[in-house]
Amino acid sequence: MHMSKSFLLISMGLASISVHAQTLTRDNGAPVGDNQNSITAGENGSVLLQDVHLIQKLQRFARERIPERVVHARGTGAHGEFVASGDFSDLTLSSPFAQSGKVTPVFVRFSTVIHSKGSPETLRDPRGFATKFYTDQGNWDLVGNNLPVFFIRDSIKFPDMVHSLKPSPVTNLQDPNRFFDFFSSQPSATNMLTWVYTNLGTPASYRTMDGFGVHAYKWINQKGEVNYVKFHWKSQQGVKSLRPAEVTKVQGEDFNHLTNDLYTQINAGNFPKWDLYVKVLSPKALSKLDYNGLDATKVWLDVPEKKVGTMTLNRVPDNFFLETEQSAFAPSNIIPGIEPSEDRLLQGRLFAYADTQLYRLGANLFQLPVNSPKSPVANHNQDGPSNNSTGLGNVDSLDVNYEPSRLVNLTVDKQARAVETPLSGHVQQQAIRNPRDFFQAGVLYRSLSEQDKADLIHNLSGDLNKVNDAEVKAIMVSYFYRADKEYGTRLAKATDVNLKQVTKLASM
């Protein structure tokens, strides 16, 4: 019989595939005999409960999902490295900034904030910019956004704010009537609303947006000296956003544009870079600001920035769920030389972010590879679901799960002790002094180009015009009028709100 050369090659190829094929197994490692047909009682009989492969397959399928993040649900991540641009040990004893050229591995997760996991990435929203530094002192998480401020200054309002921005419990639709009703009683949101309704609220790509730590943090040096700092990631790709017409066009073509762009560019070797800058203020200088420097609704105006390093993202995750979805960020993940400030919003986030990760991933989340520190972990935390650690990991210490012990000498690092902070006053429950809710929104508005101002009015009035309550609409316009008269006047015209009513409300 004559066989063609091509037929022989195909046959040899199939044989090769057969020889090297991996056997399909169940989770217990046992081989699967048939993955196409269930076990039945006869040709047309019922499926048998003894079909353990079928049962396990369905059980595992039903348990594939973990709880969605309550905020920042839609996200994408990438690996990379941070390289210090100098020696900043005079300011902080944290290792990423200890010497020029110091390399620290990082994992970054970008995200939308309010919208759900499968939502379009074109929707207007702040964008999360969370960076996990795998330092030799432990993991440090810088958990920020692409905008420098936030809607509220006290974490006690965070659940209310998120509830107002999330879909209605009745219709399951996001509704401007709900969130502007909330914001009409929160003048502190004026600055952030101005930021998010500029075109920065619809970035063209994750590569072309800046990032901010939002809050003030403390840097502590070897001498125990304290300075307050704010962090700013500056994109080397420049900042590019989508204008209103572009948003509509992009959403119609690809509502995953942010993820697609990041993956495509990194896989093509076009690695995005960000320079990290810090603003530094001594406690005395912070106290002299004419607004509260610990207020998360404020930018530190006219404070110079200092470059401290550059981050490069150079690898996308091998598996989205294992790395991006299971990555867990929390501002409470800090290292020696960095401490939280007294910012009231940050103080609440220290608890809330860590707690929500425990809810999503369980008590042993730090054993997941993406969350596991590169530095050694030694403590007496034990057990819990999916635990695969023996704590200290030392055979000689397996029986000792407490401290102190004469059997196992587990020491502490005094450099990691909390810095001494002088306190005065009384326990109280009061709003901050000197809130100055409107002036920075005016500064931002006046800094915009005429085109950006027009887009801001278009974007903001588009949602305000969906508000049915005339009083809520007028109050909101009055806030923007108090920020800048031109801003408020143009917005009143675009929303058909009586300007006399606006000026009256603004003067109250």
UniProtKB/Swiss-Prot annotation:
Question: SUPFAM superfamilies under this entry?
Answer: Heme-dependent catalase-like
- Chain spans, region Disordered: 373-396
Which InterPro entries does the record cross-reference, listed alphabetically?
A: Catalase (IPR018028), Catalase_AS (IPR024708), Catalase_clade1/3 (IPR024711), Catalase_core (IPR011614), Catalase_haem_BS (IPR002226), Catalase_immune_responsive (IPR010582), Catalase_sf (IPR020835)
Where is the catalytic site? Answer: 72, 145
Its annotated compartments are: Periplasm
Cite the entry's keywords alphabetically.
Answer: Heme, Hydrogen peroxide, Iron, Metal-binding, Oxidoreductase, Periplasm, Peroxidase, Signal
* Any coiled-coil regions, as ranges: none
Instruction: From the UniProt annotation, give the residues forming the signal peptide.
Output: 1-21
Q: Where does this protein hold heme?
A: 353
- GO BP term (any one): hydrogen peroxide catabolic process
The Enzyme Commission number assigned here is 1.11.1.6
Biased composition regions of type Polar residues, renumbered to the chain: 373-392
Gene Ontology CC entries for this record: cytoplasm; periplasmic space
The similarity comment for this entry is:
Belongs to the catalase family.
Name the record gives this protein: Catalase
Q: What is the scientific name of the source organism?
A: Vibrio vulnificus (strain YJ016)
